[in-house]
């Protein structure tokens, strides 16, 4: 019985270690996140909001040498499922639709295996282009040739469906998993610079967190003294799955240690009995 417990505990620990070694397709280590909030009275239209965010990105890059990028959806949380439809009249498939700014893939450490990621001009104009995940490209066009093909996302709700514009595939993004047990996702990335009161941004920098946070606050206040920039947080701390997995690993390691001790006692007892 003790031996069975020992073997079972060892197998469980090995499974957890394997999961922790899963390649997520992006690098959360050293990546910081924060949120900007702007006062509506200072911004008469979406173009004014967009202007602030573009100036913020440009100023932070000039002051700190760090790239700031925006995303409509956070890491470690699977995005809402949309219907992703190809232009060949074929049936669409379920996948995620994420709006991101220029530099998103480089900052997150996501490989663009073919083509390129978005330019600043494309993100500002919300150009009709897209970066398609490898899994989505493979599912929509099994024979290959996703670059240059058209695709669109359709948001489906109880009230009906809302199709987005047709977009031309300009890049193929590497596989990304939002969690350690996630399947390879079929995601569609679209260019966009925030044009509203709120924006979640991400930054990777060589500067210590407190220094970087102070610099971001200063830049934001120089552009708009009413702008509110939340304190930075490390993206890897947002991973609730990893936190739970670490706890599970320690718990299983404890069980395995107990099982080892019991197994040794059992073997000692059997050996002592045989000698007598």
Please name every model-derived segment.
Residues 1-15, 263-266:
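Short, strongly hydrophobic transmembrane alpha-helices
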Residues 3, 34, 254-267:
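Hydrophobic transmembrane alpha-helices
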Residues 10-135, 155-160, 164-165, 218, ...:
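Structured, solvent-exposed hinge/loop segments at the ends of secondary-structure elements
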Residues 15, 247-250, 254, 267:
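Residue-level recognition of specific faces of alpha-helices
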Residues 55-68, 134-135, 158-249:
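"Rare, low-scoring activations can occur
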Residues 137-145:
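Surface-exposed connector loops and short turns at secondary-structure junctions
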Residues 147-151:
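A glycine-biased structural micro-motif
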Residues 265-276:
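Intracellular coupling helices
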């Amino acid at each position: 019985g003790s031996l069975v417990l020992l073997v079972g505990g060892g197998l469980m620990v090995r499974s957890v270690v394997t999961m922790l070694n899963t390649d997520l397709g992006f690098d959360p280590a050293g990546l910081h996140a924060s949120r900007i909030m702007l006062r509506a009275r200072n911004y008469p239209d979406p173009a004014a909001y967009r202007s602030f965010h573009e100036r913020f990105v440009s100023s932070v890059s000039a002051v700190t040498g760090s790239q700031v990028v925006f995303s409509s959806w956070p890491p470690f949380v699977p995005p809402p499922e949309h219907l992703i439809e190809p232009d060949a009249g074929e049936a669409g498939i379920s996948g995620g639709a994420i709006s991101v700014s220029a530099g998103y893939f480089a900052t997150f450490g996501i490989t663009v295996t073919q083509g390129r990621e978005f330019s600043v001009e494309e993100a500002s104009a919300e150009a009709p282009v897209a970066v398609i995940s490898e899994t989505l490209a493979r599912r929509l066009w099994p024979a290959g040739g996703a670059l240059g093909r058209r695709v669109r996302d359709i948001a489906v709700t109880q009230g009906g469906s809302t199709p987005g514009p047709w977009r031309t595939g300009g890049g193929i993004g590497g596989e990304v998993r939002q969690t350690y047990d996630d399947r390879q996702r079929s995601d569609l990335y679209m260019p966009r610079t925030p044009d509203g009161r709120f924006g979640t941004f991400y930054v990777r920098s060589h500067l210590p967190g407190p220094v970087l946070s102070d610099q971001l606050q200063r830049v934001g206040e120089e552009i708009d003294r009413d702008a509110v920039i939340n304190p930075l947080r490390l993206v890897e701390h947002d991973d609730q799955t990893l936190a739970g997995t670490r706890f599970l690993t320690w718990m299983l390691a404890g069980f395995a240690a107990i099982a080892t001790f019991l197994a040794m006692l059992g073997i000692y007892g059997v050996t002592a009995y045989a000698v007598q």
